[in-house]
Amino acid sequence: MMADSVFNEHAHKALAASYPALPAHLSHSLASHPLLDMEALAGLATRMRPETLEHNAAVDLPLGISNADTPVNGLSVHDTIARIDECGSWVLLKSIEQDPSYASLMRDVLAEIAPLIEQVTGPMLRMEGFIFISSPHAVTPLHFDPEYNILFQARGSKTMNLFPVADPDIIGQQFFEQYFAGGPRNLPWQEEWAARANPISIVPGEAIYVPLLAPHWVQTHDQVSVSLSLTWRSEWSFHHADACRFNRRLRRLGVSPRPTAIYPVNNKIKSYCQRALTRLGG
């Protein structure tokens, strides 16, 4: 168990005021945690399942690039970590809870905010941890995530540019429906959208709460960046996902369904229909 609180009183109040629909700029005490230094992360990468490691070239990427078009860097993931200050790349360590030490860290941090979260969206489900190791000026293109997320900055600095979940110009229903049917999460980009962004910059000791499904893109600043991302789902998020699958099913039958609802409106009827059809093998 962690001896000290990760979040101070101000951070708890900021998260409570924003969760679940709005982003929040928070402070935290994890910046000097030994599990987040580069030596520890290089060691973690050697213990992880290969399929939970990702890396690619990441400097000067177009914001609307697809996963399939993202360039490789010609290095192994371990060499990329060793040369991260010079190789213009990005490394993602996924599902870090597969390692007992990082699983304990994740549980302890999320347990601290569980009472706040659970009184709003119910139990924290499918908790996962991710670590991003990025070269200076690395770009993470525009995308959305199916989880609630707190991004903790441990080294270097970066800016996240967030957009509203309900902005149909940026993230129409078709993107949700495609993603929950197995499609990509990256989104196309138009330059005129830049003025709609809510940019939040973080340095070590700061964090961002990223709302479920909120489109965002990220760029690191002049130094190597290390960020810890802790995520969770809720019953509402799973109902939304299944409702998106049901809408896609209806479109294939020639029906134009109403869009899935945004929190706090639920999507249970469509969700239960999708689950019933899935059980029947449809």
Predicted regions, residues:
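A short hydrophobic beta-strand segment most commonly corresponding to one strand
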Residues: 173, 222-238
